[in-house]
Every structure is written in structure tokens, then in C-alpha cells.
Amino acid sequence: MPKFFLRRVELSLEKPRVERHLAAILAADVAGYSRLMGADEVGTLARLRTHRGELLDPAIEIHRGHIANTAGDSILAEFGSVVDAVSCAVEIQRSMLERNSETPPDQRIEFRIGINLGDVVSEGTDIFGDGVNVAARLESLADRGGICISRQVLDQVEGKLDVTYRELGRQNLKNIAKPAEVFAIHLDAAASPGSRFLATANLKQEIRYCKAPDGVRLAYATVGS
């Protein structure tokens, strides 16, 4: 048998090469999707298409991400920058608050978002791996209209974005071997009613002056909300 033929057979038996890389993964899902579909299937699908076409898909593209997978009410997106991923999520959730302001509560489309930084496996445009699985589990922990992130994400964005965070502690995530430190991004000045966790205080520092009995002018700082 010719040697070149043997070589071709050997190559065909080799396992396909796995492409791995580090990425910021954003997983988004519609809260209460089954209920919304049961109440108004046509209207729900139309509203979801509108939100995606006018907000979600453009926001992901503007923040240099790409959509890896979609399935009904869920979106999986990948970013090369953690800051871009979190900025995108914050823009989406803040914009959805405005979009839902005049929509009846029982018709509102509200997203939960989870973001993780981890190693992923690429297959075409789709991504897989524990990094993706953790992002999906973080999404399930988020409040309606909320964002949950992992410790790895917080370490990359802390001090770089104009948002505060709530520590949710170590959480056992389904089918994930180790507990994960989870944080919720605080999107507005006060915790929303029904929030499962206490919001981090938004503290301000102010310099004030006073005069001592001997006439010396003193400066002091006040810290508070």
C-alpha cells in the first residue's frame, strides 16, 4: 500500500483539533418566558424580536461582541473584553427599564443576565465549556432585569465602570464542581422591591471646614450617602 495513502488514513483517524481561548461570556434569558408565551404567543414573539433588533443585537455588536448561539428566549454572546461585556449588559438592562416603563407588567419582557470570564471551546461560531456553563448558572441567579457576575469578572472591571456591586457570597452552581463567588451589579440608586440581596451603599465623601476656638481653620471629611 502506498505510503502517502497510509498517511492519509492516519490523518483521518486523528481527533479534530479543539480550539480553546479565554473569553468573557454573556448569557441572557427572558424571565417568565413560558408564562408570557402562554398568555400571548404572537405578541411576546413580536416584542422579543423588536427588543433584539433594536437593542440587544446592536448593543452586542457596538461593544465588540458576537452572538454565539440563540435558542428561543436565550442569547449567548462572547466578548474579547470583560469591560465591554459588562458595559453591554448594563446598557441593555438600563434601556429595558425605559422600554418597559409604559408596558403593562404582565406583558413586560425582562432579561436576566450572567457574565463569566473563562476558557471556552469554539466550534464554528458556537462556544462550549465550563466557562459558558458558569455564565448560564449566574444568569439563573440574577433578579428580573438584573446582572450577576463571577469573581473573575469583578476583578477585571472593578473601578473601571460607574456601577456598584452587591456581594452574594459563594454559591453552589448546578453541575459546577466548585462553589463560585457571585456578585450582582447594582443598576440604580436603591434596591428594587423584592430584591433577594442587600444593595451596597453608594457613599460620597465631602470636605468641610470649621474654626477651632483658637481661630485656626480646620478641614474634615464626611462620608455618607
Question: Which residues are covered by each model-predicted region?
Answer:
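Residues that act as N-cap/strand-start positions at coil-to-secondary-structure junctions
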Residues: I62, N202-K204, D214
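Short hydrophobic/aromatic beta-strand or adjacent loop that forms the aromatic wall/cage
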Residues: P179-V182, Q205, R217
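A short loop-to-beta-strand scaffold at the N-terminal edge of the catalytic core in hydrolase folds
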Residues: P213-V223
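Catalytic NTP-binding/metal-coordinating core of nucleotidyl cyclase/transferase enzymes
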Residues: K3-F4, R8-S95
